[in-house]
Swiss-Prot record:
This is Large ribosomal subunit protein bL27. GO terms for biological process: translation. It comes from the Bacteria. Binds the 5S and 23S rRNAs and also the tRNA in the P site. One of its GO terms (cellular component) is cytosolic large ribosomal subunit. The lineage of its organism: Bacteria, Thermotogati, Deinococcota, Deinococci, Deinococcales. InterPro entries: Ribosomal_bL27, Ribosomal_bL27_CS. Pfam families: Ribosomal_L27. GO terms for molecular function: rRNA binding; structural constituent of ribosome; tRNA binding. The gene is rpmA. PROSITE patterns: RIBOSOMAL_L27. Part of the 50S ribosomal subunit. Contacts protein L18. SUPFAM superfamilies: Ribosomal L27 protein-like. Keywords: Ribonucleoprotein, Ribosomal protein, RNA-binding, rRNA-binding, tRNA-binding. HAMAP family: Ribosomal_bL27 (MF_00539).
Length: 91
């Protein structure tokens, strides 16, 4: 039976800060330009029309509109922004 802790226990005990990854705006939600849509590691989702990608693969809205998720085949998932419908008042 050991009477000293050994070297293993003193080298443990670290943890990393949470990164808060995932989808931030879901399909059908109305967004403004600059809103973050998805925080991700790698390109789990790809940028579609009206969506930009940051250097850490974060997807964000380039224009105002509604979020649309599109699945194209196997493993190709795109996020696009559908332009907001402008309502005209009838006289």
């Amino acid at each position: 039976m050991a009477h000293k802790k050994g070297v293993g226990s003193s080298k443990n005990g670290r943890d990393s800060n949470p990164k808060y990854l995932g989808v931030k705006k879901f399909g059908g939600e109305v967004v403004k330009a600059g809103n973050i849509l998805v925080r991700q590691r790698g390109t789990k989702f790809k940028a579609g029309q009206g969506v930009g990608m940051g250097r850490d693969h974060t997807l964000f809205a380039l224009s105002d509109g509604k979020v649309v998720f599109i699945n194209k085949g196997k493993g190709a998932r795109f996020i696009s922004i559908e332009a907001a419908q402008t309502e005209v008042a009838a006289d």
